Amino acid sequence: GQDFGTAMTQTIFQPLGLTNTYLNVPTQKMSDYAWGYNKDKKPVRVNPGMLDSEAYGIKTTASDLSTFVKANMGIFPLDNTLQVALNNTRKSYFSVGKMTQDLIWEEYAMPVDLPTLQEGNAPKLILNPTPVRAQEFSAKPSSNVWVNKTGATNGFGAYIAFVPEKRFGVVLLANKNYPNAERVEIAYK
């Protein structure tokens, strides 16, 4: 087996051409590494912690994250093993309301309105126990869906959304943890 960092670098980052994506930012790239700002407006970086690499430790650029979104939409050819792995991250497991929870992503059938997206990305839903319904697996990911994921740490906030059928995606990276509702609204517009 490999450690997580080596596995991510060799099987995901390098094959996708993510040249500015790291678990540990190299010394020569530290001047490009943005400072985040916490709620007290003090500069912060992502703190090391238990499972930090696995849970929240990837540092990237908007360009590399856009490449990752394109790969998830199947816009460019990939090694079959990697494409199957990316497709598997979009297999639906559970649903709650109009949101379907995949392995990584959340999905909403199109058309979808802003209040539905905001509700599905609200702290109330994310942080509290919520009854769900099990889903049957489909052979391949749906294409006429809004796929999204929020992410944040103390000083950073991110939001990714894409609609595979339209071959359209949005990547938002901020060096402040803005509320999910604001991130979703910006992407939706």
Regions found by a protein language model. Give the residues of each.
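Catalytic loop of the DD-peptidase/beta-lactamase superfamily, centered on the K-T-G motif
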Residues: 9-10, 14, 45-189
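Active-site helix/loop module of the DD-peptidase/beta-lactamase fold
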Residues: 2-41, 77-81
